Amino acid sequence: MIGQNLTLIFNESIDIAKEMHHNILTTEHLFLATLNNTQGISILQKCGGNIQEMRQMTNLYLKKYIPYSQEVSKSPKQTPALDRIIESMVSHAQNSNRQSIDVGDLLASIME
């Protein structure tokens, strides 16, 4: 049900959280991983997005607002906001009778 690109983005978002020593996994981690994905970049550029600026702003946000942990979590805990985005993404796909979820669905759910 989840497309390959989306799986890669989820895995990279977990890696980003670990690298930044964050014990929680947020929407911003997921968005930052999307900014490193070719399909995500393509969609955002077609909408007029400045990828470099969005990366910088998202990194700044994560460093400023997400607490640094001395220990690296093996599995950062998803925030309730991230849970809602995932639920919304799945719900939209089910309601439109689609069998798979892709990067576009993720971005639509984040912007919702």
Q: What are the residue ranges of the model-derived segments?
A:
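Histone-fold recognition with a strong bias for associated Lys/Arg-rich disordered tails
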Residues: M1-E112
